[in-house]
Amino acid sequence: MSSYFVNPLFSKYKGGETLEPTYYDCRFPQSVARSHTLVYGHGAAAPGFQHPSHHVQDFFHHGTTGISNPGYQQNPCALACHGDATKFYGYEALPRQPLYGTQQEATLAQYPDCKSSNSTNPGEGQGHLSQNSSPSLMFPWMRPHAPGRRNGRQTYSRYQTLELEKEFLFNPYLTRKRRIEVSHALSLTERQVKIWFQNRRMKWKKENNKDKFPGQRGEAEAEAEEEGNEDGEAEEGEDKETEEKEESKE
């Protein structure tokens, strides 16, 4: 099993080269040596540390499954000797690039308008936003005095209401000529006068439950009086005839 993985490795290295990683060829720095003297003293011997290079070679040559030497111990200064973890097995770390910058440049490349707006000053950007927020198109119904937009309810003054009531009592139906005269006299439009009279007629019908309006009341009374007079005259004539018949019989 081990030979299957070892053979490709030997084809890459020459006979004089070794498979020893580069990070083992380091020396103790002065700070580590100084700490060693403080911990163990000048005359004390440091714990046993054995270079693991021959174990690596034995592993590839003999196919051993692991390091079987019981005397091997991990020294506390091993991390300082080995150096940075990014240089493990001789590989150096690649230079890091800011991810946010690359993503931002990619998005700005797709949308050049955003890039041009970001390059401007903040004050100019705020002005640009305020200009964009305002509507660019003005439709007719958005204007204050648009023809298709409904106006508020018309309020009539006391003088206008009084004059309209007088005109309604005189004649509930106005001709076109009289409507124009009333509208000019009261500073109203012809349509406003027409609507007021329509509403007033409906109100009067609901209050009185009658079909005849106040302007037609005099005519109706006159007709009723005439009918009553005719009936009275007819009754008087009949009474006279009956009296004459009775006298003749006697």
Curated annotation (Swiss-Prot):
It is found in: Nucleus. Belongs to the Antp homeobox family. Residues 206-220 have a biased composition (Basic and acidic residues). SMART domains: HOX. GO terms for cellular component: nucleus. It comes from Danio rerio (Zebrafish). Keywords: Developmental protein, DNA-binding, Homeobox, Nucleus, Transcription, Transcription regulation. The gene is hoxc8a. Residues 149-208 bind DNA. Pfam families: Homeodomain (PF00046). PANTHER family: HOMEOBOX DOMAIN-CONTAINING PROTEIN, HOMEOBOX PROTEIN HOX-C8. This is Homeobox protein Hox-C8a. GO terms for biological process: embryonic pectoral fin morphogenesis; endocrine pancreas development; exocrine pancreas development; regulation of transcription by RNA polymerase II; swimming. It comes from the Eukaryota. PROSITE patterns: ANTENNAPEDIA, HOMEOBOX_1, HOMEOBOX_2. A motif (Antp-type hexapeptide) lies at residues 138-143. GO terms for molecular function: DNA-binding transcription factor activity, RNA polymerase II-specific; RNA polymerase II transcription regulatory region sequence-specific DNA binding. Residues 221-241 have a biased composition (Acidic residues). Residues 115-136 have a biased composition (Polar residues).
